[in-house]
Swiss-Prot record:
Gene: mppe1
E.C. designation(s): 3.1.-.-
Protein name per Swiss-Prot or TrEMBL: Metallophosphoesterase 1
Positions bound to a divalent metal cation 1: D120, N158, H261, H315
Keyword annotations of the record: ER-Golgi transport, GPI-anchor biosynthesis, Hydrolase, Manganese, Membrane, Metal-binding, Transmembrane, Transmembrane helix, Transport
Length: 405
C-alpha cells in the first residue's frame, strides 16, 4: 500500500499517452485521407463532373414523337499515343490516363451509338517496328475499349503511316488490318436504330496526292465507285434509274458526311475563332498544300464527286469552322490529348437522314488539374507546419509545468 499514491500518476500518464496516440492517428489519417481525396477527385471524379454538363444537341425540326431515328455520334481526333522512341514514361502515363478517363467517362455518361477517331491515333506509327506496333495497339485497345452497343471506327493519319512520300503498302496494310479501315469506305451504320440513317465516307488523306502512285490510284478508283453509288441514291426517282443503277449497291438517299484526317484546302487558320482555335501566332502561318491541308485540286474534286452535307477533319489540333462553296460546313476537331493542347474536346453529333446538329464537349483542362494539386499541396503543407508548431508549443508548455521549484 506504500505505492498507492503512484496510481493516479500512472493513470494520468496512460491517459496522456493515449491522447497523444489519438492525436497522431488523427494527424496521419487527415494527411493521407486528404491526399487520397485530392487524387480521387483529380484522376477520376473530375472527368464525370465536367462531361456530365454535356448533352446531345437536339436536331432542329425533329420532334420527340417523330419516328425518325437519331444517330448519336462522337468525333475525336489526334490522340497521338506515344511510342518507344519519343515517349517518356511519365508523359505517356499522364496523357494516356487523361484520354482513357475522358473517353470512358464520356461513354458511360453519353452512351453514343458510334465513335469516330479522325486519324493520328499513334504518334510513331510511321516508324514503329512490328513489336512496338503491337504494343501500341494493345494500349490503344485498352484505353478505347467500348461496350458492344457502341461502334468504334478509326481513320488513318500521317503519324500512323507517314506523309505521302513516307507511306508504304506495308504500313497502310498494317493499319487497315488492325482497324478494318479502307480509304474510300462508305459506312452506313446498320443495326443502330434498325435503319440506314446516314452515310459516312472515310478517306485516307495521304492518298489524295494526285501523283498517280499505286496507293493513290487505288484510293481514287474507290472514290469514283462511291461517287457512282451516291449519285444513284440521288436519282431513284429518275426515269433512267433502273437502267443506269441496276447493279449498284443501294445507299441512304441522304448526302454523305465526309470524314478524313487532313482539312480541305484553306489558306490558314486566320478566320478561325473560339477559345480552342489556334493561337494568334499560329493563325499567321500559311498552310502548305498536301502537308497541312489537302491540295486545292483534291479538295475541289472531293466536293464535286461526293457532294457532302458535312465534313469533319483533324490534323491541326485546333478548332475551326469553314464554309466551302458557301453551303458545305467543315469542322476541324481539336486534339483529344493534353499533349497537344491544354483544353481538349470532342464533337457530339445528333444525326438523321436529312438533318444534323453538333455540339462541343470540353474535357478538364490540364491547368485546372495542376492548380488543384498545387493548391492542395500548399494547404497540406500549411496544415503539417501548423500541427508541428502546435506540438512544439505544447511540449514547451508541458516542460514548464513539470519543472520543479
Amino acid at each position: 500500500m506504500m505505492f498507492k499514491h503512484l496510481v493516479p500518476l500512472r493513470n494520468g500518464f496512460n491517459k496522456e499517452r493515449t491522447s497523444r496516440l489519438k492525436a497522431r492517428l488523427f494527424f496521419l489519417s487527415t494527411i493521407f485521407g486528404s491526399i487520397l481525396l485530392v487524387f480521387f477527385f483529380c484522376e477520376f471524379l473530375v472527368y464525370y463532373l465536367v462531361i456530365v454538363k454535356c448533352s446531345w444537341p437536339e436536331v432542329k425540326g425533329a420532334h420527340k414523337e417523330d419516328s425518325t431515328p437519331v444517330l448519336k455520334v462522337m468525333f475525336l481526333a489526334d490522340t497521338h499515343l506515344l511510342g518507344e522512341i519519343r515517349g517518356h514514361w511519365l508523359d505517356k502515363l499522364r496523357r494516356e490516363w487523361q484520354m482513357e478517363r475522358s473517353y470512358q467517362s464520356a461513354l458511360w455518361l453519353l452512351q453514343p451509338d458510334i465513335v469516330f477517331i479522325l486519324g493520328d491515333v499513334f504518334d510513331e506509327g510511321k516508324w514503329s517496328i512490328p513489336q512496338a506496333w503491337s504494343s501500341d495497339v494493345a494500349r490503344f485497345q485498352k484505353m478505347f475499349r467500348h461496350p458492344p452497343h457502341t461502334q468504334l471506327i478509326v481513320l488513318v493519319g500521317n503519324h500512323d503511316i507517314g506523309f505521302h512520300y513516307d507511306m508504304t503498302v506495308y504500313k497502310l496494310s498494317r493499319f487497315e488490318k488492325t482497324f478494318n479501315f479502307t480509304s474510300g469506305k462508305l459506312v452506313s451504320p446498320k443495326g443502330i436504330n434498325h435503319i440506314l440513317s446516314s452515310s459516312f465516307v472515310l478517306l485516307n488523306s495521304m492518298a489524295l496526292e494526285g501523283d498517280d502512285c499505286h496507293i493513290c490510284r487505288a484510293a481514287e478508283d474507290q472514290l469514283r465507285r462511291i461517287s457512282i453509288k451516291l449519285n444513284c441514291s440521288r436519282m431513284r426517282e429518275h426515269p433512267d434509274f433502273q437502267k443506269k443503277c441496276k447493279n449498284v449497291e443501294k445507299t441512304p438517299v441522304s448526302a454523305p458526311i465526309l470524314l478524313q484526317h487532313y482539312p480541305l484546302y484553306r489558306i490558314s487558320d486566320s478566320e478561325c475563332t473560339g477559345e480552342d482555335s489556334a493561337s494568334p501566332e499560329e493563325k499567321k502561318v500559311l498552310f502548305k498544300e498536301k502537308y497541312d491541308v489537302l491540295s486545292q485540286d483534291a479538295s475541289e474534286k472531293l466536293l464535286q464527286l461526293l457532294q457532302p452535307r458535312l465534313i469533319l477533319s483533324g490534323h491541326t489540333h485546333s478548332a475551326c469552322e469553314v464554309l466551302h462553296q458557301g453551303k458545305i460546313p467543315e469542322i476541324s476537331v481539336p486534339s483529344f490529348s493534353w499533349r497537344n493542347r491544354n483544353n481538349p474536346s470532342f464533337i457530339m453529333g445528333s444525326i438523321t437522314a436529312t438533318k444534323y446538329s453538333l455540339a462541343k464537349c470540353f474535357l478538364p483542362t490540364e491547368n485546372t488539374i495542376i492548380y488543384i494539386y498545387c493548391t492542395a499541396s500548399v494547404l497540406l503543407t500549411g496544415y503539417v507546419l501548423a500541427c508541428l508548431w502546435l506540438c512544439i508549443c505544447q511540449r514547451i508548455h508541458s516542460g514548464r509545468k513539470q519543472k520543479p521549484i
